[in-house]
Swiss-Prot record:
UniProt keyword annotations, A-Z: DNA-directed RNA polymerase, Nucleotidyltransferase, Transcription, Transferase
Annotated organism of origin: Burkholderia vietnamiensis (strain G4 / LMG 22486) (Burkholderia cepacia (strain R1808))
GO biological process assignments: DNA-templated transcription
The protein's name in its UniProt record: DNA-directed RNA polymerase subunit beta
InterPro entries hit by this protein: DNA-dir_RNA_pol_bsu_ext_1_sf, DNA-dir_RNA_pol_bsu_external_1, DNA-dir_RNA_pol_su2, DNA-dir_RNAP_su2_dom, DNA-dir_RNAP_su2_hyb_sf, RNA_pol_bsu_bac, RNA_pol_bsu_CS, RNA_pol_bsu_protrusion
Length: 1368
């Protein structure tokens, strides 16, 4: 079994019963694959597939001028490499993007040759098409310096859908069926029945019209319409009555209106009897071909075809006319015998299209098209061209209508065609097929579609969303180009004169900057990043809105199984509209979610894994992942629990066709991190999933002792850790960088065989949490590709570590844990267990004002030297300074306009010559309520403005760091080259060389060591081939040096060029403050099971409940928080955590008494291999076993995968192993060893009964009391009402609301109430009066008129009612 570099150091013992058959796919694959498909940057231009940018270009180009004599063709596109890297973009507030250039060809045709087109001239040119933001390797975008994520959208797939209104529209509760054809782009076409069973259509939700208008408009006559939707009854008229051609099926269930006889006149069905199956068999046996029917049987039937007099050509009756006596008379007169009528009945063949045709007043195709034109463009006069153009543009034009590949596939599947490809526009037979199915549905045949089925909803990823925006921009460009193409020849224009890239740039910028789906990345911890990128939203442009979404859309659907997580979704108005992808879910080429299954053949599980979409899944019988199988993969049980078409049932093994790949298949990443998820209530699991994303990274991350085994995947895929790009040996490591000498077999010729990893140190995340990477390798370590070299925020040895393992006791403690409050020991705070670092960014800009430029300087009048003490000569704070609220960080002065001086001031000015008061101090100060340490300063200066010393120093430091990297690379490259050289030179014969090397001497190692390396090249060798090799190595070293010098120059040029700043800004300074936040009462904390609470008190360590050996608990939780919430998982986690820590203590004790390695091996084997998944400890050397044991002292980490976790029996075994009887007796444990006798810390008395005690992974959430606590002294007031503003951001007051007023009224506290409603709120004169009175020492309140009363009076006056206040 292969262990990675970090896995060896600390193996997580897994309780999984099932082997891993399918690895969890890369968690950010959807985002990265989608965007790389969009760009196709690494694909040669000629081999690009028609998707993404290529598809957008080819769909708009070629653009042809109005006269047709000039056209602009698209050849290919190319993306340049970005000007700044990701880190530089974040610092400078730029977008990480690449310039898109398209090669286009302008073709001008000869106007003189009218017959066939002759090309007159061709101009080809590369044209700039705007900037395209690039995705970072972790799946986010850097837009204006901030990281953003484009969330995937779950929208209704294009295609055709049939539904009914569930009887809600009409009072009778009748089901009204409707169909809707939804294209990817273009007009929607709806068909719907009304309560009278007439079929209407509407375009884009406009006014409805009878559907036969549309059928006539596509060129069908009434006869053809009827022939398409009905079968006919054939009658032959006799002198008396008529004969009906006998079709047995059509008579079943009808009541005979006359005696039905066979050919011999024998009565088979008597009058008024219902015709049943036996009657029909008798008629068939009698070989009846025709049935004689009386004349009145014909009356009221509907003619299927026009009846024309053969002699005169006169139309006697039209199709869809009713047969009346007068019609029959005319027919007999004309001698017409055979007529056809529509066959309808009340059960399964309604006369809907016939009734619709009767309502329709249009006569022919033209009239129908005019009617449609009038509906679409009311009030415009219909000319023939306009009418034709509009109708063709609606559904038949490729520019305006696109069903898309998906839409065509879904359409063809739904209407029952075999092929899934076809034209992207709507065809006549598509419209007919849709109406036919809709009529069949109304007739009671077939099923309506389930709109929430994941086969009818597809995911639009970044690439597709960006492509749509880009295409929209291109279409705007196309319009402009069309206009100008006409003048292209006469004005001798080049392609770049025709194309203006502004519309494309603005469309892209708007999408990435302000679209509803482009969101500020949630960067609180690695899990929140991953979850954000795997989120699927039903909101956004082209999706649902919160208000319109009902319960059905938000609900969990059977097809979500393995595709979308049923647990993780926000609470509140977005519940069910924003979802998370399940762990193994994957998108297919059409954008439908698929999930993997193992193929089962003849009740034997094979290794074949198939990805099935929701549509395909419905056809198979699928067993769950926990079905029992023997070692050969044979299903054992007589009945297996399985699913088919959304229903769960027990079936025999031979019927099973597929099986789930893993028990965790149905949940998302966040939910799969919750141990014992199977024992938690779904609502609490939902809260647990959401709260893990709010966990603040702690100063020292600690792995969870009870995990689920997915922590490593999560940490590595999030990109917070540093992974080895290639294997090799660690050559150098410090806190900020790791240098790796790459293995020879992985080094590529022509590339540097050195990998340098610069770690991220104390950087601010989007949520102001701290991102910091710490190396976990030592010099000389051998690492392989993909191994973790450095831990990031919230990771510990390459595993996700969101919180800390706390010793938890479930017991009440003096009411301090009432209502989910949390009691915490002072030791937790003293040990900095939950201390987190938050980084605040404070900006100041110096602008060019009308009165002159603002200046960043240390020279500020009216400021004491104490306040300027922390600023350097440029007026910018030193790094490392500890600052409090109100301290100056950057000194800045702004010119202010000359004010009119009083004569006294003029006199003072004349005497003291004080000129400094024409500037005002606008320095950057630390905001109220904040204090911390300055950890970084960035200075940006506009081009052409002299840099100050501080800015120059920052640039020099950056260059020094870069030079260090280059020197390391060169050192290793040269070292390798000289090693190769030494191997080659030793033993060769020389023709001469430095230090008087004689001709014919053999070179030995000692001679080489004595020489300076660079003098080796002066040795002249006798062997020509070797001499050539020597020359080649010398050249390659010189070439590398030259490359490094060029790279350094380029870096210097980039750093010394002026910064791009917003207009009017001369200089910008960013100061970063690190704020340490310790745990304090009021902070929100939570476990992983939705068990959240607020810290109520931090108790001295000596007062906490303690065990018999004197160890106190860290946290005391209320036991009443468990039963009603039904999240029992937390109790099991505490038991297993107790065992994990106990085992760690036993290993620690062995190490302390320096037990033999063999004893350690035996104990570790007992832990790892007596239950659950087996670990290969045999392959470990003694050193590795020792290192493993050292890392296990703080607890043996357990993995209990979701739905496949540790059983009670296994937990019992682990507890027995951790606490042998002597320890259990000492601690006075219960027999099952999960409850311990505790003693009261204040009295020393033992508690009445034993307490459940153990370790739980507990998190500190991002809702910190420091961010919410706030007090107002004097602050801003609202403009109109003159009441204080509200909220911390506005430095507002606390609202004294309606209910608080009632409370004071109830106590009769009238003066307090008057004070609250006047001088403490909006009595403007009273407010100032109070201050005056206090100054005079006269403590009286003069309450006046509240301003809001004046506002009310004004409002009433605006209604025309005059109110005057009688002041007496």
């Amino acid at each position: 079994m292969q262990y990675s570099f970090t896995e060896k150091k600390r193996i997580r013992k897994s309780f999984a019963k099932r082997p891993i058959v399918h690895q969890v796919p890369f968690l950010l694959a959807t985002q990265l694959e989608s965007f790389s498909t969009f760009l196709q940057a690494d694909v040669p231009a000629t081999q690009r597939k028609p998707e993404g940018l290529q598809a957008a270009f080819t769909s708009v180009f070629p653009i042809v001028s109005h006269n047709g004599f000039a056209r602009l063709e698209f050849v290919s596109y190319a993306l340049s490499s970005p000007a700044f890297n990701i880190k530089e973009c974040q610092q400078r507030g730029l977008t990480y993007c690449s310039a898109l250039r398209a090669k286009v060809r302008l073709v001008i045709l000869d106007k003189e040759s009218p017959n066939k087109p002759v090309v007159k001239e061709v101009k080809e040119q590369e044209v700039y098409m705007g900037e395209i933001p690039l995705m970072t390797p972790t799946g986010s975008f850097v837009i204006n310096g901030t990281e953003r994520v484009i969330v995937s959208q779950l929208h209704r797939s294009p295609g055709v859908f049939f539904e009914h209104d569930k009887g809600k529209t009409h009072s009778s509760g009748k089901l009204l069926f409707s169909a809707r054809i939804i294209p990817y782009r273009g007009s929607w076409l709806d068909f719907e029945f009304d309560p009278k069973d007439i079929l209407y259509f509407r375009v884009d939700r406009r006014r409805k019209m009878p559907v036969t208008i549309l059928l006539k408009a596509i060129g069908l006559t009434p006869e053809q319409i009827l022939a398409n939707f009905f079968v006919f009854d054939n009658f032959t008229l006799m002198d008396e009555g008529a004969q009906l051609e006998f079709v047995p099926e059509r008579l079943r269930g009808e009541v005979a209106r006359f005696d039905i006889t066979d050919r011999d006149g024998k009565v088979i069905v008597q009058k008024d009897k219902r015709i049943n199956a036996k009657h029909i068999r008798d008629l068939e046996a009698a070989k009846t071909k025709f049935i004689s029917v009386p004349e009145d049987y014909l009356l009221g039937r509907v003619l299927a075809k026009n009846v024309v007099d053969g002699d005169t050509g006169e139309v006697i009756a039209s199709a869809n006319d009713e047969v009346t006596e007068s019609v029959l008379e005319k027919l007999r007169e004309a001698g017409i015998k055979d007529i056809q009528t529509l066959y309808t009945n009340d059960l399964d063949q309604g006369p809907y299209i016939s009734s619709t045709l009767r309502v329709d007043e249009t006569t022919d195709r033209t009239a129908a098209r005019i009617a449609i034109y009038r509906m679409m463009r009311p009030g415009e006069p219909p000319t023939e061209e306009a009418v034709e153009a509009l109708f063709n543009r609606l559904f038949y034009s490729e520019e305006a209508y696109d069903l898309s590949k998906v839409g065509r596939m879904k359409f063809n599947r739904r209407v029952g065609r075999d092929e899934i490809v076809g034209p992207m526009t709507l065809q006549d037979d598509d419209i007919l097929a849709t109406i036919k199915i809709l009529v069949e549905l109304r007739n009671g045949k077939g099923e309506v579609d389930d709109i929430d089925h994941l086969g009818n909803r597809r995911v639009r990823c970044v690439g597709e969303l960006a492509e749509n925006q880009f295409r929209a921009g291109l279409v705007r460009v196309e319009r402009a180009v069309k206009e100008r193409l006409g003048q292209a020849e006469s004005e001798n224009l080049m392609p770049h004169d025709l194309i203006n890239s502004k519309p494309i740039s603005s469309a892209i910028r708007e999408f990435f900057g302000s679209s509803q789906l482009s969101q500020f990345m949630d960067q609180t911890n690695p899990l929140s990043e991953i979850t954000h990128k795997r989120r699927v939203s039903a909101l956004g442009p082209g999706g649902l809105t919160r208000e319109r979404a009902g319960f059905e859309v938000r609900d969990v659907h059977p097809t979500h199984y393995g595709r979308v997580c049923p647990i993780e979704t926000p609470e509140g108005p977005n519940i069910g509209l924003i979802n998370s992808l399940a762990l193994y879910a994957h998108l297919n080429e059409y954008g439908f979610l698929e999930t993997p299954y193992r193929k089962v053949v003849d009740s034997k599980v094979t290794d074949q894994i198939d990805y099935l979409s929701a549509i395909e899944e419905g056809r198979y019988m699928i067993a769950q992942a926990n079905a029992a199988i023997d070692e050969n993969g044979q299903l054992i049980d007589e009945l297996v629990s399985s699913r088919e078409a959304g229903e769960t049932m027990m079936v025999t093994p031979d019927r099973i066709q597929y099986m789930d790949v893993a028990p965790s298949q149905i949940v998302s990443v966040a939910a799969s991190l919750i141990p014992f998820l199977e024992h938690d209530d779904a609502n609490r699991a939902l809260m647990g999933s959401n709260m893990q994303r709010q966990a603040v990274p702690c100063l020292r991350p600690e792995k969870p002792v009870v995990g689920t085994g997915i922590e490593r995947t999560c940490a590595v895929d999030s990109g917070t850790t540093v992974q080895a790009f290639r294997g090799g040996v660690v050559d150098y490591v410090d806190a900020g960088r790791i240098v790796i000498r790459v293995n020879d077999d992985e080094a590529v010729a022509g590339e540097v065989g050195v990998d340098i990893y610069n770690l991220i140190k104390y950087t601010r995340s989007n949520q102001n949490t701290n991102i910091n990477q710490r190396p976990i390798v030592k010099m000389g370590d051998k690492v392989s590709r993909g191994d973790v070299l450095a831990d990031g925020a919230s990771t510990d040895l390459g595993e996700l570590a969101l919180g800390q393992n706390m010793l938890i006791a479930f017991m009440p403690w003096n009411g301090y844990n009432f209502e989910d409050s949390i009691l915490i020991s002072e030791k937790v705070v003293a040990d900095d267990r939950y201390t987190s670092i938050h980084i605040e960014e404070l900006n100041v800009v110096a602008r060019d004002t009308k009165l002159g430029p603002e200046e960043i300087t240390r020279d500020i009048s009216n400021l004491a030297e104490v306040q300027l003490g922390r600023l350097d000569e440029s007026g910018i704070v030193y790094i490392g300074a500890e600052v409090e609220a109100g301290d100056v960080l950057v000194g800045k002065v702004t010119p202010k306009g000359e004010t009119q001086l009083t004569p006294e001031e003029k006199l003072l000015r004349a005497i003291f010559g004080e000129k400094a008061s024409d500037v005002k101090d606008t320095s950057l100060r630390v905001p109220s309520g904040m204090s911390g340490t300055v950890i970084d300063v960035q200075v940006f200066t506009r081009e052409g403005i002299q840099r100050d010393k501080r800015a120059q120093q920052i640039i020099d430091d950056e260059l020094k760091r870069y030079r260090l990297d280059l020197n390391d690379q060169l050192r290793i490259v040269e070292g390798d080259a000289f090693q190769r050289l030494a191997r080659m030179l030793v033993g060769k014969v020389a023709n001469g060389g430095p230090k008087k090397l004689a001709k014919g001497t053999k070179i030995d190692q000692a001679y080489l060591e004595d020489l300076d390396h660079y003098h080796w090249f002066d040795i002249r060798l006798a062997d020509d081939e070797a001499a050539a090799q020597l020359e080649a190595i010398k050249n390659s070293i010189e070439e590398k040096r030259h490359q490094f010098d060029l790279a350094f120059e380029e870096k210097r040029k980039k750093l010394t060029q002026g910064d791009e700043l917003p207009p009017g800004v001369l200089k910008m300074v960013k100061v970063y403050l690190a704020v340490k936040r310790r745990l304090q009462p009021g902070d929100k904390m939570a476990g992983r099971h939705g068990n959240k609470g607020v810290v109520s008190k931090i108790v001295p360590i000596e007062d906490m409940p303690y065990m018999a050996d004197g160890r106190p608990a860290d946290v005391v939780l209320n036991p009443l928080g468990v039963p009603s919430r039904m999240n029992v998982g937390q109790v099991l986690e505490v038991h297993l955590g107790w065992a994990a820590k106990g085992l760690g203590w036993r290993i620690g004790e062995m190490l302390q008494r320096q037990a033999k390695i063999e004893e350690l091996r035996v104990f570790l084997t007992k832990i790892y291999n007596e239950s659950g998944r087996q670990e290969d400890l045999e392959s470990f050397t003694d050193e590795e076993i020792l290192e493993l044991a050292k890392n296990l002292r703080e607890g043996v980490p357990f993995a209990t995968p979701v739905f496949d976790g540790a059983t009670e029996e296994e937990m019992g075994k682990m507890l027995d192993l951790a606490f042998p009887d002597d320890i259990a007796q000492q601690l006075d444990m219960n027999p099952s060893k999960n409850q311990v006798r505790l003693y009261d810390g204040r009295t020393g008395e033992q508690f009445e009964r034993r307490v459940t005690l153990g370790y739980m992974h507990y998190l500190k959430l991002h809702h910190l009391v420091d961010d919410k606590m706030h007090a107002r002294s004097t602050g801003p007031y609202s403009l109109v009402t003159q009441q204080p503003l509200g909220g911390k951001a506005q430095f507002g007051g606390q609202r004294f609301g309606e209910m608080e007023v009632w409370a004071l009224e109830a106590y009769g506290a009238s003066y307090v109430l008057q004070e609250m409603l006047t001088v403490k709120s909006d009595d403007v004169t009273g407010r100032t009066k109070v201050y005056e009175n206090l100054v005079k020492g006269d403590h009286v309140i003069d309450a006046g008129m509240p301003e809001s009363f004046n506002v009310l009076v004004k409002e009433i006056r605006s209604l025309g009612i005059d109110i005057d206040l009688d002041r007496n």
